[in-house]
Amino acid sequence: MASLFKKKTVDDVIKEQNRELRGTQRAIIRDRAALEKQEKQLELEIKKMAKIGNKEACRVLAKQLVHLRKQKTRTFAVSSKVTSMSTQTKVMNSQMKMAGAMSTTAKTMQAVNKKMDPQKTLQTMQNFQKENMKMEMTEEMINDTLDDIFDGSDDEEESQDIVNQVLDEIGIEISGKMAKAPSAARSLPSASTSKSTISDEEIERQLKALGVD
């Protein structure tokens, strides 16, 4: 019951009009077919009257034929008009839909513009840029600190490599025995003796101190 009292939309009205126009078009086509049938019958009658020499009958039938052909011509004009109306209705419907879409879009844009504050948006972008710069600076400081730490570790490893190389040059192996070695003050010769040639006895004494047989 509710659908009976529902207000028709524009689409509903246009659909009804199109149905009526299609019905009118079919009726015009049927009328034209009937007129063409009558036209052929009149032509046959005129030929028949002409064969028997009945001029008066031929004249009357000829007038009817002229009137019928005029009526048939009118059906073509009316049919073209109906087709034009149907096309125009479709165009109007399309234009109304586009206008409705534009109206909806305009309302949406208006609502968005009301919600959006240009000053607030600009401030948000500036804050983002500021915080991003802070983050980049913090990251750079952390990277510099880590580089310093690891660079120091590399220096320590490099120093240890130099010590190992020097000990290796004088024929001392330190694999697992450096902890048992005497301190540098006792194991290393003085500045005056370091300049002299190290004797075999000195080397043997250092090896025994390191626990090397």
From Swiss-Prot:
Coiled-coil segments: 25-55
Residue ranges, annotated region (Disordered): 178-202
Chief localisation class: cytoplasm
Compartments in which it is found: Cytoplasm, Cytosol; Late endosome membrane
Modified-residue entries (N-acetylalanine), positions: 2
Topological category with respect to the lipid bilayer: Peripheral membrane protein
Keywords: Acetylation, Coiled coil, Cytoplasm, Endosome, Membrane, Phosphoprotein, Protein transport, Transport
Motif (MIT-interacting motif): 201-211
InterPro entries: Snf7_fam
Biological process per Gene Ontology, one example term: late endosome to vacuole transport
GO CC terms, sorted: cytosol; ESCRT III complex; late endosome membrane; multivesicular body
Pfam families: Snf7 (PF03357)
Protein transport listed as a keyword: yes
Biased composition (Low complexity): 179-194
Source superkingdom: Eukaryota
Phosphoserine modifications at: 199
Task performed by this protein: Probable core component of the endosomal sorting required for transport complex III (ESCRT-III) which is involved in multivesicular bodies (MVBs) formation and sorting of endosomal cargo proteins into MVBs. MVBs contain intraluminal vesicles (ILVs) that are generated by invagination and scission from the limiting membrane of the endosome and mostly are delivered to lysosomes enabling degradation of membrane proteins, such as stimulated growth factor receptors, lysosomal enzymes and lipids. The MVB pathway appears to require the sequential function of ESCRT-O, -I,-II and -III complexes.
Description of how the protein assembles with itself and partners: Probable core component of the endosomal sorting required for transport complex III (ESCRT-III). ESCRT-III components are thought to multimerize to form a flat lattice on the perimeter membrane of the endosome. Several assembly forms of ESCRT-III may exist that interact and act sequentially. Interacts with CHMP2A. Interacts with VPS4A. Interacts with VPS4B; the interaction is direct.
Family that this chain belongs to: Belongs to the SNF7 family.
Protein name: Charged multivesicular body protein 2b
Organism: Bos taurus (Bovine)
Lineage of producing organism: Eukaryota, Metazoa, Chordata, Craniata, Vertebrata
